[in-house]
Regions:
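Conserved ABC ATPase signature
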Residues: 136-140, 144
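Conserved ABC ATPase "signature" region
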Residues: 106-131
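Helix-to-loop junction immediately C-terminal to a conserved catalytic motif
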Residues: 46
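ABC ATPase NBD coupling module
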Residues: 61-80, 112, 221
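Q-loop/switch helix immediately C-terminal to the Walker
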Residues: 80, 87-107
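Catalytic Walker B motif of ABC-type/P-loop ATPase nucleotide-binding domains
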Residues: 161-165
Length: 233
């Protein structure tokens, strides 16, 4: 069953109109050169960018009209992480659950963060020590911040995970940990610069100069097709 559908959706100058169905529980990798449109496609899929042609449907409804619980079912791990540096690890993790709670709960998170036990649980899942709970994010290393962003995503409990270059600048061990956690989610669309990892996924999408030019199982993608996808021609 398709949970996310793009019908001739596009962004002038960035993405040519495309048709795409992301199915429930499916692990999909998005490949292509820098500037091919991968980040723009992720933005269309989570609603942070609005298609100027066609439409995007989430659970059968226009994504731009989705609110509340339905919209919160899409979680995104951005390449720039989008953490609040001045807040603690727990406060940043709890922000993943803001949509499920009241404004009062959100204000409390800024003053006396609740749900510390839940925070510790998701921190353990991403390999962060409990001692980091009340530590400002600004004091953490790049790899530690990546884990905080992933913990925030897990706290959100999304039905579909979108990730924009989540493995860039990570050492091999951390990259493997992050990829395993993302693939363990119910369904995902992950943008990567690592075609060597495509066999970890069920489906491969390829973007070239803003056009969707590949959509197949990893076993069907040839060396020649990958070379063309990343070529200058």
């Amino acid at each position: 069953m398709a949970v996310l559908e793009l019908h001739r959706a596009g962004l002038t100058g960035r993405l040519q109109p495309l048709d795409l169905r992301i199915n429930d529980g499916e692990a999909t990798v998005l490949l292509g050169r820098s500037g091919a449109g991968k980040t723009s496609l992720i933005g269309l899929c989570n609603g942070s960018l609005l298609a100027d042609q066609g439409q995007v449907l989430w659970q059968g409804q226009p994504l731009r009209r989705c609110r509340g619980a339905l919209r919160r079912q899409i979680g995104t791990l951005w390449q720039d992480l989008r953490l609040v540096e001045e807040l603690t690890v727990l406060q940043n993790i709890n922000s993943g659950a803001l949509g499920r709670h009241s404004l009062l709960w959100g204000l409390r998170n800024l003053i006396n963060p609740p749900d510390q036990s839940i925070g510790r649980q998701v921190m353990a899942r991403v390999g962060l020590p409990p001692s980091f709970l009340h530590q400002p994010v600004s004091t953490l290393s790049g790899g530690e911040r990546q884990r905080v962003a992933l913990a925030r995503l897990l706290r959100q409990q999304p039905a579909l995970v979108l990730a924009d270059e989540p493995l860039s600048a990570l050492d091999p061990r951390l990259a493997e940990d992050v990829l395993n956690l993302l693939l363990a989610q119910h369904g995902c669309l992950i943008s990567l610069h690592r075609p060597d990892l495509m066999h970890r996924f069920q489906r491969v999408l390829g973007l070239r100069q803003g056009a969707l030019v590949l959509d197949a199982a990893p076993s069907a993608i040839t060396t020649e097709a990958l070379a063309w996808l990343y070529s200058d021609d």
